[in-house]
Amino acid sequence: MLYPNQKTLATIAGVVVSPLNPMYTSLILSKGLKMGPLEGIKILDLSLYGPGRYCSMILADLGAEVITVEIPRSAGKMFGMMTSDTEAHYIGLNRNKKSIALNIKKDEGKEIFYRLAKKVDVILETNRPGTLKRRGMDYETVSKLNPRIVYCSITGYGQNGPYARRPGHDINFVAMAGILGLSGSKNGPPSYIVSPMIADVLGGTNQAVIAIIAAL
């Protein structure tokens, strides 16, 4: 499924994908520099929020071909700052990427996912542990279709342990780490450090980028 006002960019594994906000290309691509250290690497991004999208943005800037899987009818509505019909964070985090709207809860959507999984080099996801396993989209399943796949999962509390199934965002993690306790006035409550997203970026994005590149 293509989003409105977007032209077809490519067909991969028989699946048509489209450009994400083609008017907002990065400086590198707009200057006509076509090569990058990850040129030829294909990445399927199942993530929804900052850590995963920022990770695949960096990989796309390095030359990888990134295809983001969007929830139908929700593209561009997941972040906070609106610009016309598309949010500013969404535009920034999805530069240089392609997209496909896919309902992975349905058999048809999963079949398309499997076709793409056979052709890509990397799959990136940010679901809670066990979510994609229940849908038959976990590493064990995908690696049987594509033994060379690099499968990266970004989670808040790891794959196992007492907190593994808990949802969480940056503010939860920095609070648990005690960072919020270092902020604010001496006798007042802590103040949330708005930017940068310390836990999401340093603990999630950066480590994921390093791990993926190392695995490749």
Predicted regions and their residues:
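Acidic, Ala/Val/Gly-enriched low-complexity intrinsically disordered segments
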Residues: A10-V17
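Hydrophobic alpha-helical signal/anchor motif
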Residues: Y3, S18-L20
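Extreme N-terminal basic, low-complexity initiation segments
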Residues: L2-T8
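N-terminal helix-loop segment corresponding to the beta1-alpha1 unit
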Residues: Y24-L216
